[in-house]
C-alpha cells in the first residue's frame, strides 16, 4: 500500500473516533427548585439540573455539587425509568449522566423527580424546554406527580431567580405550614410569577413544550381472561360464604360456648356472638351486591371477610381442646408448605404470572403468620377460644391463596423474570421506598415507624431470597408513604377530590397498560376496590389507589423475553441524532480528504525536490 493512502486511512479513523462520540452525545438543562436548611428554617433555593445522554447500556450516573441533604440517586433512576416508560422507549442503549449544581447544600431527593423526568423526556424526544419554567414534585408510578414540601419557599425562590412559571403538583395550591395557610395563586399574583398545577408527567411536558406525549384513554379494555377468572374466584369465595353460613345457622352457641364463657374470662355474653354473625351477614350481602355490579375483586374481598367471621363462629362452637387446636394448626401448616412448594416449581413467564404468584404467596405468608399468632395465644393462655379467629383467618387465607393461583399460566407477553432480575427489582424498590420515607421524615419526623417496619420486612424477604414478596412489600411501603404525602397539609374536605383525581390517573394508567398487552391484575383489582371504598372510607380508597399505581407498573423493572435486538442506526437513534452522525461522518471524510491532499502534495513535492537534487548530484 502506498504511504499516502495508508496515511489517509489512519487519519480518517482518528477523525471518526474523535468526532463520532460528540455526535452521539446530547445535552440538556433546566432549573431545579429546592429548599435549603438554614438557622431560621427552610428557605427556597435554585439549582441547575444538567443531563447528558451518550450511547451505552442503560446506566444512570448522578453527581451533585455540593452533596444534597437527602439521597437523590434512587429518585433519579426511578424518574428515568418512568420517563422511558412514558414514551415507550427502551433506554438500554444509552447512558444517562445527571448533574445537580447549587451554591449551597440543598434538599433534593424525591422532590426532584418530576424535574428529572421532564428533562429526560425532552432529551429523548428532542424537544426544546422553556428555560424560564420550573417544576417541583415527586414522580410516581404511572407518571403521577406527587406532593412535596416547601412550596411557598420554592415559588419565592423561583421569582427571585427570574423564572416566569412554576408547575406544582395538582391539589397543592393551598399550603398549610407553621400554623398558617398560604394560597399560592394569591402569592404568585403578588410576586408576579405564574403558578400552574400538573397531575402527570404528560401534563408537565405539555406545559413546558406544548407537546402531548401520551394518549388519553377513555375506558379500560378489561381483559376477558381476567374477568372470567376473577368472576370464578369471587363466585367460589361467595359460594363458600353461603355454605359456611348454612353450617353456622343451626349451631347453639349458648349451650356449646357462651354458657361457659364467664369461667374463661372472654365472650361473657351472647351479644359478641351476635356481632360476629351480623358482621358476617353484612359482608355476605356486600359481596353479593358487588358481584351483581360485576365488581368481582370487591365481591371476593367482602366474601373473604364473611368467611373469616363464619369460620370463627364454627370454631367457637366446636369448643376445641388444646390437642385438637394443635392438630388443626399442624394440618394447616403442612398444607401451606405443600402449596408453597407447588408455587415455587411454577415457571413464571408473564407479568400476570408474577402478580398471581405475589398475590397467592402474600396470602400464604399471612396464613403462616396467623398460625404463629394462634400458637402463641394458645401457649400463653392455654385457651382455645382466644385463638379461634386467628386460626379461622389462616384457614381462609390459605383458601384464597388457592383461588388466586388460578391466574397462573394465563396468556400474555413473556418477560425475563429470572432470580437475578427479580432480586434487582426488589433492591431498587426498597431503595425507592426508603428514600421516599427519609424525605417525608424531614417534614413530619418520628411518624413513619410502621412504614419503617414494612421496609424491614421487605429487606427480610430479600435476605431469604423471596424476591417477589420483597418487591410487593416494598411497593406497598412506598405506596404508604405516598398516601401520607398526598394528604399532608391538606384539608380533610379535599380528600374526596384527591381520591377522584388519583383514581382517574390510575384508570388511565391501567388502560395504557392494557393497550400494551399487559393487563395488571393486581393494579386493576386495587383500583376497583378503591372505587368501591371512596364514598364510605376515603382514606382507604386513597391507599388502595396508591397500591394500584405501584403494582400496576411492575413491567418497568423487567424486559420482554426474546425481544430482538434493535439496530442502533435504524431504531435506537432518533432522526436528528442520525443526521448529526451522518454530518459528522461527512465532515470527517472531507477533513480527511483535505488533509490527505496536503499530505500528498507535500509528499510529491518533496519527492520531486529529492529527484532534482539527485540529478544535480549525479551531474557533478
Q: How would you describe each model-predicted region?
A:
Residues 9-18:
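Bacterial N-terminal signal peptides
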Residues 24-281, 285, 317, 326, ...:
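Peripheral, non-AAA+ core regions of ATP-driven protein-machinery
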Residues 288-317, 378-409, 459-486, 537-557:
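Charged, amphipathic alpha-helical scaffolding segments
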Residues 465-573:
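Membrane-proximal extracellular "stem/stalk" segments
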Residues 588-605:
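Alpha-helical transmembrane segments
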